[in-house]
């Protein structure tokens, strides 16, 4: 929740200067770090990595897959563009429906 408060506070302070401030809050993104965590859990639990991803990492997600880094990048590019110049103080979950629960 600290990220949300910081985003809103800085957005209010920076807005008069023409600066927008937003945050992206992704769930599990397919990165080497996450892939390593899945492998570690697979060894610990004695189950295949695919099962770890689905039953452990994505158990609460409505969409059962990891997020592609490009999906996060596309949102970041949009938020940094002139097309998003009226958007500030917002937090964008890219969480496969996790926060919908």
Give the location of each predicted region.
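Short, small/polar-rich loop/turn modules that mediate ligand/substrate recognition or access, typified
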Residues: 15, 20, 87-89
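Proline-glycine-enriched beta-turn/loop adjacent to the NAD(P) cofactor-binding site
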Residues: 22, 26-27, 31-32, 90, ...
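Catalytic Tyr-x(3-8)-Lys segment
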Residues: 40-70
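C-terminal substrate-recognition "lid" of short-chain dehydrogenase/reductases
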Residues: 63-94, 99
């Amino acid at each position: 929740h600290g990220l949300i408060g910081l985003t809103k506070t800085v957005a209010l302070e920076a807005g008069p200067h023409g600066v927008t401030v937003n945050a992206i809050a992704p769930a599990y993104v397919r990165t080497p770090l996450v892939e390593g965590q899945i492998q570690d859990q697979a060894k610990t639990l004695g189950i295949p990595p695919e099962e770890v991803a689905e039953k452990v990492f994505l158990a609460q997600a409505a969409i059962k897959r990891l997020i592609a880094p490009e999906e996060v990048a596309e949102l970041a590019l949009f938020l940094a563009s002139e097309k998003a110049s009226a958007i500030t103080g917002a937090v964008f979950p890219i969480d496969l429906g996790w926060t919908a629960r």
